Amino acid sequence: MADSEEQEDYKIQGFDADIQNLLKTALKEPGSVDLEKAANVIVDQSLRDSTFSREAGRMCYTIIQVESKQTGCTMFRSSLLNRLQVEYRNRKETRARSLQEWVCYVGFMCNVFDYLRVNNMPMLALVNPVYDCLFDLVQPDSLKKEVEVDCLVLQLHRVGEQLEKMNCQRMDELFSQLRDGFLLQGGLSSLTQLLLLEMIEYRAAGWSMTDAAQKYYYSEVSD
């Protein structure tokens, strides 16, 4: 029963049996499996599956915590960060190849940033790479693609406040570009304009939204 709950909890039922066993063991006894392989499996699936990428940060956090507690090692975290660094360096090629893979990567990076902690603080090593990805998403070409705007808004809702606390200057620069795109760039869809305006007001209100504003924006989106 516990296995089936865990499988469902972390949405690993789509993997073949060997990979499911690898991940389930990594979650319980990480010292007994190939953690570099486990990290690569999680990243590979996160780049293909946006639903899984939203879960994966929590899974990575669990494996890191259990490994630290049981063995005192950080093999999984090192393997994960090494692989994320490779994907970060290749992000332009990823975007050119597949927008879906690109937004999955950004979502996964932000999810890992959201969950991973060192001394109860976000990992400094991830702050600038996450910012760089968000800056990519406010470029004029990206603002013309609703899938990228959706990703930008979703990730800023998730980690914007944390990122600002880690580096306020870069958040100011990001929102300066976002505002310029909203005010000056032609050819944006009405949905994109609505989402960008909502995000500008969301940050201006201290990363929060009144009930009235939420009803307004989301009734407009649903229309």
Swiss-Prot record:
Chief localization: cytoplasm
* Chain ranges of the MIF4G domain: 9-206
This protein's UniProt keywords: Cytoplasm, Nucleus, Translation regulation
Q: Where in the cell is it found?
A: Cytoplasm; Nucleus
Alphabetical list of Gene3D superfamilies matching this protein: 1.25.40.180
Cite the Pfam families for this sequence.
Answer: MIF4G
GO cellular component terms attached to this protein's record = cytoplasm; cytosol; histone mRNA stem-loop binding complex; nucleus
Molecular-function annotations in GO: RNA binding; translation activator activity
Q: Which residues cross the membrane?
A: none
SUPFAM superfamilies (alphabetical):
ARM repeat
Q: Which InterPro entries match?
A: ARM-type_fold, MIF4G-like_typ-3, mRNA_TranslReg/HistoneTransl
Q: Name one GO biological process term.
A: regulation of translational initiation
Q: Partners and quaternary state?
A: Interacts with eif4g1, eif4g2 and slbp; probably tethered by SLBP to the 3'-end of mRNAs ending with the histone stem-loop, it also interacts with eif4g1 which is bound to their 5'-end.
Q: Which family does it belong to?
A: Belongs to the MIF4GD family.
Function in brief: Functions in replication-dependent translation of histone mRNAs which differ from other eukaryotic mRNAs in that they do not end with a poly-A tail but a stem-loop. May participate in circularizing those mRNAs specifically enhancing their translation.
Name of the molecule in the record = MIF4G domain-containing protein B
Q: Which organism is it from?
A: Xenopus laevis
